[in-house]
């Protein structure tokens, strides 16, 4: 069963108008890993309506390899695909990391809740 809304550990990504960029997907995986872990759903609108994933992200093996190669330290994710209301949804499960995770291009991100209770991705500043 799909969650009905986003939270600190649940993120919906729409691909109805345009595919998410690969960088946007990796940014969200990094943010989830640096917070509490969680689940990224591709093909679901922010309001929970299923609209389907793009062809670009329907290959789950390629997506897993891409995420692994674009995270430091490399993150292993669990990815599955299913159909809901005739639309393909891709689910990316991200574990909470025991060490700080960054993108391969140096972005370190985390998730937090805004005052209205909705989640956002923000920079994670690490002390040297």
Which stretches of residues belong to each language-model region?
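Conserved N-terminal catalytic/coupling substructures associated with nucleotide/phosphate chemistry
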Residues: 1-128
């Amino acid at each position: 069963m799909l969650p009905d809304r986003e939270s600190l550990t649940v993120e919906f990504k729409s691909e109805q108008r345009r595919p998410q960029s690969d960088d946007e997907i990796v940014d969200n995986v990094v943010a989830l890993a640096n917070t509490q872990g969680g689940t990224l759903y591709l093909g679901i609108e922010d309001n929970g309506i299923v609209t389907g994933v793009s062809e670009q992200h329907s290959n789950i093996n390629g997506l897993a390899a891409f995420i692994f190669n674009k995270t430091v330290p490399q993150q292993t994710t669990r990815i599955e695909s299913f159909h809901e209301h005739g639309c393909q949804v891709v689910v990316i499960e991200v574990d909470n990391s025991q060490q700080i995770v960054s993108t391969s291009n140096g972005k370190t991100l985390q998730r937090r809740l805004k005052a209205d209770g909705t989640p956002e991705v923000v920079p994670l500043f690490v002390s040297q």
